[in-house]
């Protein structure tokens, strides 16, 4: 949906690929970034895309009041990408971040998690399924015209 509004945008679906968490290695990356045994997975490509973008959206589900585990793995693995390259970290943090969070509960944990990803405060749209008469476990939030309208308004605002 967002890609249809923002021309030239790219979608990266975390459920379609794997980013290996840190571990099950000798932490070679602490000595030499290039030695990370997982550097060929999607982590570096995603970070490269974000660093070279004008705006980044994260669409995140809420599991137990926190972003999903994939988001934490993505965050954890970024240390290798940025290690010894402060100019890349600065470029990443300068890219404005926006998030759409499907959540019926706590918002503060998401605000804190997103705070690590940008200089500016991340702009976050919280979509509690119950507000739209839906049950989050069913995954049918986008069948609500009001939810779709709220997402479109969020994406189109300057």
Sequence positions of predicted segments:
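Short, intrinsically disordered/low-complexity patches at protein termini
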Residues: 76, 81-82, 89-92, 133-134
């Amino acid at each position: 949906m967002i890609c249809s509004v923002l021309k030239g945008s790219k979608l990266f679906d975390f459920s379609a690929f794997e980013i290996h968490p840190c571990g099950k290695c000798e932490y070679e990356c602490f000595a030499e970034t290039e030695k990370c045994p997982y550097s060929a997975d999607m982590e570096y490509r995603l970070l490269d895309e974000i660093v070279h973008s004008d705006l980044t959206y994260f669409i995140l589900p809420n599991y137990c009041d926190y972003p999903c585990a994939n988001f934490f793995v993505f965050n954890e693995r970024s240390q290798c990408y940025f290690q010894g390259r402060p100019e890349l970290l600065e470029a990443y943090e300068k890219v404005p971040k926006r998030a759409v969070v499907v959540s019926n509960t706590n918002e503060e944990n998401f605000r804190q998690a997103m705070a690590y990803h940008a200089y500016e405060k991340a702009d976050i749209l919280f979509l509690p399924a119950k507000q739209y008469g839906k049950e989050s476990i069913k995954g049918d939030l986008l069948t609500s015209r009001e939810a779709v309208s709220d997402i479109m308004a969020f994406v189109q605002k300057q």
